Each structure stands twice: as structure tokens, then as C-alpha cells.
Amino acid sequence: KHLAGVGVAFKLAQALAAETGLPKSVVNRTLDLVGIGTIGDIVPLVDENRTLAKYGIRAINVSQRLGLVKLMEGVSLDKGAVSSENISYIIVPHLNASGRMENAGIAAGLMMGNDQEKVSQGVNKLIACNTERKKIQSDTFEICKSLVEERYKDDYFLVLDLEDAHEGITGIVAGKIKETYNKPAVIVTPTGEDCLKGTGRSIEGVNIYDL
């Protein structure tokens, strides 16, 4: 019941392969991506998730997937020695950065690509997106901290209205604000349609949907 979306997709692929007689080896070629998705989705690493993560890490360390190999080279990871921490804190943020800052298709294309030049361009783009993401995230976090200190320090529930926040990083920043002040935190931004769009993170024992 704890499977990440990628785990569900993998189980479906296994079932379809069994039904159609497709060799297991074909489905198992995706284990590197399954490992990245399982670890990156921060699901509990128990039961089947633990198995998928374990074999996913093994697959990553021997992967022939050109985009993944070049990404690991680009971020100075040694193929053969990649750990779950490397996946969580280096590989996943770079893959997510394209979706946060521009277009998730950049990362998807990289993982499917076989053209050396296009793959190199994709890696450079992901690294640039992640650098930009970290800068914007850091700046936004400092703005939020200032708002809390100036206006909302005594509030039990932090709701921060930011006009110019990049919505690709508001969830991360809300999480950091929650951790910093140990209070539920919501960041809202205008949608351009006379509405506000919000993302929130809560502390243990407080269901944000019930408030």
C-alpha cells in the first residue's frame, strides 16, 4: 500500500509482461528509473518499496542509460558508488529542477535519449535549472522568514502571501518554514485570474485539510 506511483507503474508493467510473454529482462531495464522514483517520492522504504529501492540502486550503479550516466558525470557522482543519499540529494533535485523551473520534458527526454549531443545539452540544462532553482528557493525562503519575523511570529498557523514567488519552489519553501518555526505553513501566490493558489506543509499531529 506504500508504493510510489513509479512502483505501481512497474507492477503493472510486470503484470502485462507476464500476460503477454514479454521477457522479465525487458521490464527490469527500467529498475534504475524505478529506484530513482521510489527514493525521490519519499515513500516509506518498507516491504516492496525497500526491495525496489535496493535493486534500483544496483541498477543505477551499472546503468547503461546514456542520460543517467552523463548526468552522474555532470554532477560528479562516481558510477558504481551511488547511494540512496546521492539519489535523494543530487540526482532527484536535478531531475525535478526542469519541471520546477521550466519543463519536465527536459528530464524525461534526457532519460530516454540516445543522442550524445542532445544528452549533453540536456544535462547542462538540468544543472542550470537546478542552480537557478536553488538561488530562487534561497531568496524566497529569506523573504518568508522576514515576513514571519516582522508580522506573524506569534501566529500558530503561518499563511504567507507572496506576489512574485515562483510556484515551482513554494512547496519546498513552505516545508523549510514549517521546519524552522515548527508550525503549519502555507504559501499563496496569485494565479492571474483573481484567485490565489496555495501550497502547504504541516507539522505532526495537525491535519492541514481539517483546518
Regions found by a protein language model. Give the residues of each.
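Short amphipathic alpha-helical face segments that pack within enzyme cores
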Residues: 4-11, 172, 176
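Hydrophobic, small-residue-rich alpha-helical packing segments that form membrane-like cores
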Residues: 1-8, 18, 25-26
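Alpha-helical scaffold elements that line and support the substrate/ligand-binding pocket
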Residues: 12-16
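Hydrophobic helix-and-loop "lid/oligomerization" segment in the mid-to-C-terminal part
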Residues: 17-211
